[in-house]
Curated annotation (Swiss-Prot):
It is a peripheral membrane protein. Its EC number is 3.6.5.n1. It is found in: Cell inner membrane. InterPro entries: EF-4, EFG_III/V, EFG_V-like, EFTu-like_2, G_TR_CS, LepA_C_sf, LepA_CTD, LepA_IV. The lineage of its organism: Bacteria, Pseudomonadati, Pseudomonadota, Alphaproteobacteria, Maricaulales. It holds the Pfam family GTP_EFTU. GO terms for molecular function: GTP binding; GTPase activity; guanosine tetraphosphate binding; ribosome binding; translation elongation factor activity. It is an enzyme of class 3 (hydrolase). This is Elongation factor 4. One of its GO terms (biological process) is positive regulation of translation. It comes from Maricaulis maris (strain MCS10) (Caulobacter maris).
Amino acid sequence: MTIDPSLIRNFSIVAHIDHGKSTLADRLIQVTGGLTQREMKEQVLDNMELERERGITIKAQTVRLDYTAKDGKTYVLNLIDTPGHVDFAYEVNRSLAACEGSLLVVDASQGVEAQTLANVYQAIEVNHEIVPVLNKIDLPAAEPERVKEQIEDVIGLDASDAVMISAKTGLGIEDVLEAVVTRLPPPAAGDPNGPLKAMLVDSWYDPYLGVICLVRVIEGTLKKGMKVRLMGTGATYPVDGVGVFRPKKEAIDSLGPGELGYLNASIKQVRDARVGDTVTDDRRPADKALTGYKPAQPVVFCGLFPVDSAEFEDLREAIERLALNDASFSYEMETSAALGFGFRCGFLGLLHLEVIRERLEREYNIELITTAPSVVYRLHMNDGSEIDLHNPADMPDPVKIDTIAEPWIKATILVPDEYLGGVLKLCQDRRGNQVELTYAGNRALVVYELPLNEVVFDFYDRLKSISKGYASFDYQWIEDRVGDLVRMSILVNDEPVDALSMVVHRARAELRGRAMCEKLKELIPRHMFKIPIQAALGGRIVARETLSALRKDVTAKCYGGDASRKRKLLDKQKAGKKKMRQFGKVEIPQEAFIAALKMDDN
């Protein structure tokens, strides 16, 4: 039995972090009876422990709700809950492509934020009908009229008939459901008997069933027992089962045009089920694939090393497991003289990096050292070839390099105007070019072009502290640009420490180098001989600190007598220290690495 597409509504909820979209999803599930009172818990759709704890949504989730509207018809509503954070923009992108409309949730006390903007523009790009919803109107600080004006000024959406709700108390939830049914369009009616065409929206790994794929059927019918082909990879799989989430899994016979559901087909790895791929019938394939998805490109790279080198195998297993579930995370093995065996991993951004690191530490109990995050540099060599550099330690001889290009981003920052000066100074310090500056009410919208290298380090933390937490920030990649970049090595006791080398802009090398040397001077324990700590660009030392030696007071036993006696003892000690320094090894403790990599810019 296929459902009449005019009774289906596929919609997603877009919002900035903490504006209450997961709570709204909970209420919608509760009102339509998706779960009994007893099974309800906060943030039903955020399954990952980390998601609940940080209150952020990382993986997109879906749920199918049956709702009997005021016109007496029963509608099938497919809700896709999307993440709100920049790093997971690819999750948002593909969730939106599977829907026809969006609910734009804005906190009535906070107003429009940078990520609200970013996600709304993505929804507009895929031609969504958008219904504004003002949440948290039960708060004393709520100013719905001001926020409506803001939505109209900043985003340009008509907010006169925005739905007023409080997801926490359940106020206005019925109005949201009515708005979904009346104001959002149904999916385009596909032919249920045509060749199967379905878009793969998401995929994750289930330890019992293999990979489970979330699909949105465009044309044809997806049934249990048929053989499907993924058009991107060409691989074929028998369908073991199809079903829907309400939010618990429920098997059904078939999925028709416009419907969203899951299929499991003994696929071994999430990498085989590429998001955005087209699923079709192997016997009667569709002529051409749906307009595809760009695979997510990792932007930030860093090394992950186990604190205890005996845990390397456990780390490998944990990383492989995480990669099963996260196709945008890439990894390869690497070794470091200072840290031993580990992995060089690619992430979508800093939050993604932090989330993965926390999951490794928490779900697999592995203590990790993370090296300084770096971006991918494109090296144009003198012989005309191009190299992508993921790790600053692998940089070839500078003589052979013609130019080095680094990725630039366009950053959109929304900030209350009293903090604007500090934010502009921060962007200027980070080699930014101002693109525009506009005001919406008492908030300034600043758009800057910045090198990603400068943002990766700690831009977000600095931005938050300058603006006392009020600024919101969102970025997208624009292009690679050639810059005057050099590799800076850190030498401890004349030995280069590979884990601390980094690529910096020549103008800021001395500053960065000096800060690093000072930091290491505090962190490395004193030895029996003096240790020079230097920052070098090629053969030129740009900064130096000296860690003085621990020494015994050798002249304590001399009372009076000849000065040459004292001199002899001091010279003997000096000769000993010199010999010691030749053969001595400096042990840099792991805490020193970790702290040095968290270096801030002041």
